[in-house]
C-alpha cells in the first residue's frame, strides 16, 4: 500500500485492472481463479516483495564433497554459502539499472522464468505465499483508493 500511495499512476492502473475483473462478477469478492488472471496485481505485489522481502537472509547451503567453483572462486567442501535476498533482489544485471525504483512493469516485460529463479522474498516457497497474498489483496482491497 505504501508504494501505491507514492505512485498514483501505478495505483490507477491497478484499480482499473481490479475494476475490470470484479465489475463482471456479481460477488465483489474475487475468487482465486479471477485473481490468477490479474497480471498487474501480481506484478505490484512481486515488486513490493522484491524491494522489501520478508526475509533478507539467504538460504545457507553446505558445499558438497569435492568443493565447488562459483564465479571463478573455489569453495572447499563443508563451506557454508549463502546470498542474502536483499542482494539478489537488487542486482542490476537481473532487474535493470532502475533496480531501486518501484516499477511493477518490469515483471511484465522480463522473462518470467529467469526472474523467478532469482525472486525469493520468503527464503523458500515464494509462489505459494505470493498467491495467498494476491488472494487476500484482491478480496480485501478492491477499493485501493480508500486504503
Describe every region a protein language model picked out.
Residues 1-17, 132-147:
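Cytochrome P450 catalytic-core helices
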Residues 3-55, 71, 76-79, 101, ...:
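Cytochrome P450 I-helix active-site segment
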Residues 12, 83-111:
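Conserved cytochrome P450 K-helix/beta-meander segment immediately N-terminal to the heme-binding cysteine loop
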Residues 28-33, 71, 82, 89, ...:
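Cytochrome P450 heme-thiolate "Cys pocket" and heme-binding signature region
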Residues 59-65:
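Short, structured beta-strand/loop micro-motifs enriched in basic residues and often containing a Trp
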Residues 66-70:
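Short acidic-hydrophobic surface loop/beta-edge motif
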Amino acid at each position: 500500500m505504501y508504494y501505491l500511495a507514492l505512485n498514483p499512476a501505478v495505483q490507477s492502473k491497478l484499480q482499473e485492472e481490479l475494476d475490470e475483473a470484479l465489475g463482471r462478477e456479481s460477488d465483489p469478492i474475487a475468487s482465486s481463479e479471477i485473481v490468477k488472471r490479474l497480471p498487474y496485481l501480481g506484478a505490484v505485489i512481486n515488486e513490493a516483495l522484491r524491494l522489501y522481502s520478508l526475509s533478507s537472509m539467504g538460504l545457507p547451503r553446505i558445499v558438497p564433497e569435492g568443493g565447488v567453483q562459483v564465479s571463478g572462486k573455489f569453495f572447499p567442501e563443508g563451506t557454508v554459502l549463502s546470498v542474502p535476498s536483499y542482494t539478489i533482489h537488487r542486482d542490476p544485471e537481473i532487474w535493470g539499472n532502475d533496480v531501486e525504483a518501484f516499477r511493477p512493469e518490469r515483471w511484465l516485460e522480463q522473462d518470467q522464468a529467469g526472474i523467478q529463479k532469482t525472486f525469493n522474498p520468503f527464503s523458500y516457497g515464494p509462489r505459494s505465499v505470493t498467491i495467498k497474498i494476491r488472494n487476500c489483496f484482491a478480496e480485501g482491497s478492491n477499493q485501493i483508493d480508500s486504503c
